[in-house]
């Protein structure tokens, strides 16, 4: 066991710890922002229960989110980065009680190097992005350390150049209020989650320090009027760091020995520069795409880093530092799930658990279809299709990392930890993370028709573009021009149906009016264009449909009986998904109709019992 931390509670010797037994399995648990924000007590109990039951636990956390997603920490951080590039607002006074004004020097509480977060200083709390040094250099302060650096190796940083405090008019940037809101929310969470004492005091100081470091970073960005993609990554990573500090402290406060693991510098220059780890294909956006070897190297390093925690429970930031081409550009907002997946691969975990606020994957959205049932087992292909067509399961690329390692993924409810959840199993023909074979689906749900689809989902806010060409051009040239136009506009097509001179495409309606008009104008050079708005994609998904006869006929006949018009039909090459486009106003009706006709069990004693087992 590492000795970097000193006791912060009188019951330190009684803390629950991971075992040193190499034969015991690792379980990696990923908690979403809402779970961290609302169910911290449950998280600490869940971690303790898994350790008591003989597992070694590592947890990965997203940035906090409480009431609404728009007020989640990540969204607020992105808002602050946008505000940093706005002109400062003039004011005659500070206008914010207890907060740093635009003319004040940022406040940096003195860090106690031997405290609970002391380990973080020497291993993880180093510079999170080199671009800040470049910002400071442009400001003539190249000797100043990054405000994101560990305080163990520097004195409190000076604030970026600000207007003179003698000025009668202070400048208050727009991001001030946003940073204050982030700080206020995390301080309130710390006070609500921990009993008073040195540990809570230290946590509050850490929150103050991180938020004021963020403020200084935004000041510097405002002065040069630029935030690079890697700088934005660093700004966004503050959310995971704040959340994990609260979770790590809450675990310790409740008797679980934990260690904060900040991954700001897990990707070093050797990984970034390794030509074999980065694909030479720059892609359409001009950003080099990371190859699988990069993620293999990263998972290995993550496994090494987490094993260094010894018996402490690693509490891992989902943000894993600047990567070539920017984390947000390479991966997007789902980087926390990917981090958890790579941790599971690096630790050779028996299972990756994704804890949400729902019991698992259902046959349909239970908020829209009251008769929806929990699906106990699902294949990776089915989960990927459901995610792509409207159900928030887990990103397919994230899923691919653990499935390649034959590690199952279990989706569970943080409010109902005793529930079985839904398990995404790797193909059973290959070795997995566990030695035991996964239970057969027919054993769990006896009497269920094996040809039955798995789930039905809806994706709304869809538009359909129909392009017809009367020219006798070759079809490949016709399609090439269409997709070249869509590529230049940055449009991703969800469904497509083609003939030699006609193409129908369904896509999400994310374009504003001007961009859509520009796209239509460009496409009109190729052929006649019509646009249908307020549409939805209805998708029936199920691996068993590959060998079923009449699934499509049953689906479309059911919609016809319900007087629901079909605008477009598409079936994937994998044969596990049948999709059609309908009017958005019919979406909920269609969901219930298809669920009743295609996913309801025949009423017999055997299937009644199966239905009970699925509840």
From Swiss-Prot:
It catalyses: L-aspartate + ATP = 4-phospho-L-aspartate + ADP. Residues 90-102, 127-164 have a biased composition (Low complexity). Residues 84-105, 127-171 are annotated as: Disordered. Its EC number is 2.7.2.4. It is an enzyme of class 2 (transferase). GO terms for cellular component: cytosol. One of its GO terms (molecular function) is aspartate kinase activity. Residues 467-537 form the ACT domain. Keywords: Amino-acid biosynthesis, ATP-binding, Kinase, Methionine biosynthesis, Nucleotide-binding, Threonine biosynthesis, Transferase. GO terms for biological process: 'de novo' L-methionine biosynthetic process; homoserine biosynthetic process; lysine biosynthetic process via diaminopimelate; threonine biosynthetic process. Pathway: Amino-acid biosynthesis; L-methionine biosynthesis via de novo pathway; L-homoserine from L-aspartate: step 1/3; Amino-acid biosynthesis; L-threonine biosynthesis; L-threonine from L-aspartate: step 1/5. Disruption phenotype: Homoserine auxotrophy; the presence of methionine and threonine dipeptides (but not threonine amino acids), or homoserine, rescue growth on proline nitrogen source. Pfam families: AA_kinase (PF00696), ACT_9 (PF22468). Belongs to the aspartokinase family. Phosphorylates aspartate, the first step in the biosynthesis of amino acids that derive from aspartate (the aspartate family of amino acids), including methioinine and threonine, the latter of which is a precursor to isoleucine. NCBIfam families: asp_kinases. PANTHER family: ASPARTATE KINASE (PTHR21499), ASPARTOKINASE (PTHR21499:SF59). This is Aspartokinase. It comes from Cryptococcus neoformans var. grubii serotype A (strain H99 / ATCC 208821 / CBS 10515 / FGSC 9487) (Filobasidiella neoformans var. grubii). The lineage of its organism: Eukaryota, Fungi, Dikarya, Basidiomycota, Agaricomycotina.
């Amino acid at each position: 066991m590492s000795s970097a931390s000193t006791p912060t509670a009188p019951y330190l010797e009684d803390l629950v710890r991971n075992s040193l037994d190499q034969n015991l399995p690792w379980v990696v648990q990923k908690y979403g922002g809402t779970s961290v924000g609302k169910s911290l007590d449950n998280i600490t109990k869940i971690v303790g229960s898994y350790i008591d039951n003989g597992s070694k636990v590592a947890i990965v956390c997203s940035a906090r989110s409480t009431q609404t997603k728009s007020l989640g920490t990540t969204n607020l951080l992105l808002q602050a980065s946008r505000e940093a590039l706005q002109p400062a607002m003039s004011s005659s006074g500070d206008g914010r009680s207890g907060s740093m004004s635009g003319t004040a020097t940022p406040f940096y509480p003195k860090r106690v190097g031997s405290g609970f977060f002391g380990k973080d200083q020497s291993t993880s709390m180093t510079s999170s992005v080199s671009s800040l040094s470049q910002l400071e250099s442009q400001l003539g302060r190249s000797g100043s350390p990054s405000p994101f650096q560990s305080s163990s190796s520097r004195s409190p940083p000076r604030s970026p150049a600000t207007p003179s405090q003698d000025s009668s008019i202070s400048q208050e940037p727009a991001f001030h209020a946003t940073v204050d809101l982030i700080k206020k929310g995390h301080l309130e969470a710390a006070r609500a989650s921990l009993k008073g004492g040195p540990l809570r005091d230290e946590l509050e100081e850490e929150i103050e320090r991180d938020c004021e470091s963020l403020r200084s970073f935004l000041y510097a960005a405002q002065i040069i009027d630029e935030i690079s993609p890697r700088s934005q990554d660093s700004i966004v990573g503050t959310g995971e760091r704040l959340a994990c500090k609260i979770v790590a402290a809450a675990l310790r406060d409740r008797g679980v020995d934990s260690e904060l693991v900040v991954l700001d510098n897990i990707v070093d220059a050797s990984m970034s520069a390794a030509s074999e780890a980065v694909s030479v294909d720059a892609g359409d956006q001009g950003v080099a795409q990371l190859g699988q070897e990069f993620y293999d190297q990263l998972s290995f390093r993550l496994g090494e880093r987490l094993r260094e925690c010894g018996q402490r429970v690693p509490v891992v930031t989902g943000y894993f530092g600047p990567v070539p081409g920017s984390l947000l550009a390479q991966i997007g907002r789902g980087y926390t799930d990917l981090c958890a997946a790579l941790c599971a691969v690096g630790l050779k975990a028996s299972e990756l658990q994704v804890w949400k606020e729902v019991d698992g994957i259902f046959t349909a959205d239970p908020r829209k279809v009251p008769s929806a049932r929990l699906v106990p087992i699902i294949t990776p292909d089915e989960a990927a299709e459901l995610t792509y067509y409207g159900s928030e399961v887990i990103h397919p690329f994230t899923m691919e990392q653990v499935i390649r390692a034959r590690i199952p993924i279990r989706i569970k409810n943080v409010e109902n930890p005793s529930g079985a959840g839904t398990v995404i199993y790797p193909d059973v023909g290959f070795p997995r993370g566990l030695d035991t074979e996964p239970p057969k689906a027919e054993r769990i749900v006896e009497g269920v028709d094996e040809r039955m689809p798995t789930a039905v989902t809806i994706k709304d806010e869809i538009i359909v573009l129909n392009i017809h060409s009367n020219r006798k051009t070759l079809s490949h040239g016709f399609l090439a021009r269409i997709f070249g136009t869509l590529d230049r506009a940055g449009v991703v097509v969800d469904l497509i149906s083609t003939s030699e001179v006609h193409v129908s495409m369904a896509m999400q309606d994310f374009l504003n009016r001007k961009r859509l008009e520009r796209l239509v104008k460009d496409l009109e050079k190729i052929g006649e264009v019509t646009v249908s708005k307020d549409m939805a994609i209805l998708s029936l998904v199920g691996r068993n449909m590959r060998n079923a006869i009449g699934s499509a006929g049953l689906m479309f006949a059911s919609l016809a009986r319900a007087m629901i018009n079909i605008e477009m039909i598409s079936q994937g090459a994998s044969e596990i998904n049948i999709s059609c486009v309908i009017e958005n106003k019919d979406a909920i009706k269609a969901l219930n109709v298809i669920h009743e006709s295609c996913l309801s069990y025949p009423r017999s004693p055997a299937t009644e019992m199966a239905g009970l087992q699925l509840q």
